[in-house]
Amino acid sequence: MSEIPGDLKFLKSHEWARVESNGRVTVGISDHAQGLLGDLVYVELPGVGDTVQVGNGAAVVESVKAASDVYSPVSGTVVEVNSALSDKPETINEDAYGEGWIFVVEIDDKEQLNDLLDPDDYAELLEDDDH
């Protein structure tokens, strides 16, 4: 498993959020999640302009094993999607915390970020899951 970047926050359902310098939030799934799913074959992206709610499904990733909702870690408006994933969903497998980002949200309430797990808490969650 790859190192968990220190600038990310996480949901217990294995989505990550990175706060960008412009205050927007980039969202993806963790390296752990992509490892559980296996080779991704399809990504259903939200639409730019869509409103997303914290904890609600905003995208779908499908592997040869399963389909899984991607829950939004924050509420707001989708301002960008990673359309490259339509042609290359395996980018998430290859670089979950980088080029494999899924969408960007203009956040409604920055306080929501305080409810997310920091990298250490997320690592602890993964250790607990392994036992």
Swiss-Prot record:
One of the GO biological process terms: glycine decarboxylation via glycine cleavage system
CDD domains hit by this protein: GCS_H (cd06848)
The species this protein was found in: Xanthomonas axonopodis pv. citri (strain 306)
Keywords associated with the record: Lipoyl
GO cellular component, as recorded: cytosol; glycine cleavage complex
Protein name in the entry: Glycine cleavage system H protein
Keyword S-adenosyl-L-methionine among UniProt keywords: no
Pfam family, one: GCV_H
